Regions:
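S-adenosyl-L-methionine-dependent methyltransferase catalytic core, i.e., the SAM/SAH-binding region
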Residues: 1-167
Length: 167
């Protein structure tokens, strides 16, 4: 039996130095392994507006992907640094400033969570890692063995379901 829990550790999320949460100010990192790859701040500096918009849609189903990606690229063009979690959070809030006052607070909170999720998935190549895991899963299971995979968002869910159909 194989059990795969695809969720992020709360120890990582609750540590401001890891940059996983918009609720705590810290460096905008989001890497599961801080020694590997590039941080989310570095990724934002190199991503094109349309690529960022696609990332927000594909990795997090973000309904305000266009507005957020425009705000991020506009800020970067003006020389603004987006190196901290609060800097990104504030840009998201600015991007959603057009919303009615009674909807804004909740929308900002949800868009922050989705944006941080989308960036985390991107900088850690989480979908590629999950695809590789799913490809190797049949070889790791004993004949007649079972696997349970706990997903936490629709992107993971879609990928796992698609892979399971091929088994």
């Amino acid at each position: 039996f194989i059990l795969a829990d695809l969720g992020v550790s709360s120890m990582q999320i609750d540590n401001p130095e890891r940059g996983f949460s918009y609720k705590y100010d810290g460096p905008l990192d989001l890497r599961l392994n801080p020694e590997a790859g590039i941080s989310a701040a570095e990724r934002l500096r190199t991503v094109a507006r349309d690529e960022l918009e696609g990332m927000l849609i594909e990795n997090a189903d973000e309904p305000y992907a266009k507005e957020i990606s425009q705000a991020v690229t506009r800020a970067l063009r003006k020389g603004k640094k987006i190196d901290t979690t609060f800097a990104l959070r504030d840009l998201i809030a600015e991007a959603l400033d057009f919303l009615p006052k009674d909807e804004k607070k909740e929308a900002i909170k949800k868009s922050c969570a989705r944006t941080f999720q989308a960036l985390r998935i991107d900088v850690n190549n989480e979908y590629e890692v999950l695809e590789a895991f799913m490809e190797k899963l049949p070889d790791a299971l004993a004949p007649g063995g079972r696997a349970a995979i706990l997903t936490f968002h629709s992107g993971e869910d879609r990928l796992v379901k698609k892979s399971m159909k091929g088994l």
